[in-house]
Amino acid sequence: MELDLICRDLGVVDYAETWERMKQFTQIRSKDDADEIWLLEHPSLFTQGQAGKEEHLLAPGDIPVIQVDRGGQVTYHGPGQLVAYVMVDLKRLGIGVRDLVSVLENSVVRALALNAIEAYPKPDAPGVYVDEQKIASLGLRVRRGCSFHGLALNVDMDLTPFNRINPCGYQGLQMVDMKRLNKGVILSNVKAQLANQLAEQLGYNYPAIQQGWK
């Protein structure tokens, strides 16, 4: 049975609720359930991954910090950052975790190229970079052979909260967003571009984007 990729546009949603829905989706899905990508933004918060160290939280202040079950260290989420949660059956796709990381990175690089931004991944530091500045962060978890969590692409956002942490555990790492590199960037366009690139890299047709959870 050939399955389509389901892609959902969820708008701005609470992190804790979305995290719980991801875990539930992954726990109960069967081998016959379609893979899904959730596109969304979160209100301001820091998330600390499984490898996270307290010393990289420099001065969180009034921004909440949530300890989560993804890989990686601390990062910031906020309005104007496009988050893509990628829930795919790795075994069914015939790929491993490292392959999925490459899919996410290559999808971001291609979406950025469509906006006249030249970017690249780094083999020793997952994510996507422009002139040594980080524009997209990755963090994944695999359970029962299926992935959840995903990537965060800085589109048009306030980057100052990143100064309160060592992003992804790297002291002095500079962050950048698309708007600073291309004034014509529109988040809704980037959303569709990223969805299409993710689908193509995963071997799917371009998806119709559904609004909301259902």
Swiss-Prot record:
It holds the Pfam family LplA-B_cat. Substrate binds at R70, G71, G72, Q73, V74, T75, Y76, H77, S137, L138, G139, G150, L151, A152. Its main location: cytoplasm. Residues 31-206 form the BPL/LPL catalytic domain. Pathway: Protein modification; protein lipoylation via endogenous pathway; protein N(6)-(lipoyl)lysine from octanoyl-[acyl-carrier-protein]: step 1/2. Transmembrane segments: none annotated. The active site is at C168 (acyl-thioester intermediate). The keyword Transferase applies. Keywords: Acyltransferase, Cytoplasm, Transferase. GO terms for molecular function: lipoyl(octanoyl) transferase activity. PANTHER family: LIPOYLTRANSFERASE 2, MITOCHONDRIAL-RELATED, OCTANOYLTRANSFERASE. Belongs to the LipB family. This is Octanoyltransferase.
